Amino acid sequence: QEGENFTREVKSIDKSFLKHGDVTVKVDYSCLNYKDALILNNGAKLVKEFPHIPGIDFSGTVLESESDKFKKNDEVILTGWRVGEIYYGGFSQYAKVDGNFLVKRPKNLSSKQSAILIFFPVIFSLFSKANTVSSSL
């Protein structure tokens, strides 16, 4: 970042680059949340530290944990908590986050299904807005 200008790029980083949190997760799926789109469009307004990894929502498997809430191989979901905004997010193979931000994934949902459910409120909102617009025409 230089002033108000910043660049976007995809690059390889070492896991040691991930510095926030006590649980390291192997990310299976992440979705493009509206805040991710804002960050990718004009990150200087929301992101406080560069370089940065967006990805507000993700599902995955715990690799390492210093939290008493999670252990290796626990399947987890994360949504919100300003992850992908002020903390590194899920647009990466790995994420290191505060264990308090995670929830265990329900056993009856696959990682992919849970990622779809994370995205469902966005889809619902879009359809609701589209229906409101069409009914007012």
Kindly label every feature range from the protein language model.
Residues Q1, K19, P106:
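Residue-level recognition of the GNAT/N-acetyltransferase active site
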Residues T79-L137:
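NAD(P)H dinucleotide-binding glycine-rich loop of Rossmann-like/cofactor-binding domains
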Residues Q1-T7:
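Extracellular beta-rich ligand/substrate-recognition surface
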Residues R8-V10, K15, S59-T61, Y94-K96, ...:
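Conserved hydrophobic/aromatic beta-strand scaffold that supports enzyme active sites
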Residues D14-C31, G43-V83:
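Glycine-rich beta-strand-centered segment in the early N-terminal region that forms part
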Residues I13, F17, G60-V62, L126-K129, ...:
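Compositionally biased regions
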Residues K35-L40:
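Cytochrome P450 core scaffold surrounding the K-helix E-X-X-R motif
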Residues E2, F17, Y29, E64, ...:
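Non-catalytic surface loops within mature trypsin-like serine protease
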